[in-house]
C-alpha cells in the first residue's frame, strides 16, 4: 500500500519599509540591500519596489541597480564619473528617476544586491547632494509544503 503525500502551495510575502539618507559621491553615495533567491524552492518569486526621492528639489533622481552579489566589489571600486559601467558586471535591472514603481523577476537562483546609487555622472551637470529616499520592498513567492510538515508545526 502506497502512502499518499499531500502537497500544498503556500504564498509568502515579506515587506519592508525604509528611509535612507544617501550622501553624494563615488566613495559612499549608495545603499545596498542583499537578498537571495532559490527558484527551486521559491517559485514565482517577485521583488516589487516602490521608491520615491523625498528631496526638496524637483528632478532629483536616484539610480536603482540589481546585480549579482559577487559583482558588488567590482561595482564599488568602479569610478563612475565617466558614465560607463564595468563590462564584466551583468546588470539584472537598471533604472533611474524620482519615483520608481517596478517589479523584478530574477532569471536565475542567485544572491542579489539591490543598490540605490547617488554617485555622480559626467553627463549630469547638477550639483549632487544627500538625498532622502523612501523605499518599500515586497518579496513574494510561492512554496510547496508537504502537509505532514504543516501538522508538525502546529
What function would you assign to each model-found segment?
Residues 1-154:
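Acidic, Ser/Thr/Pro
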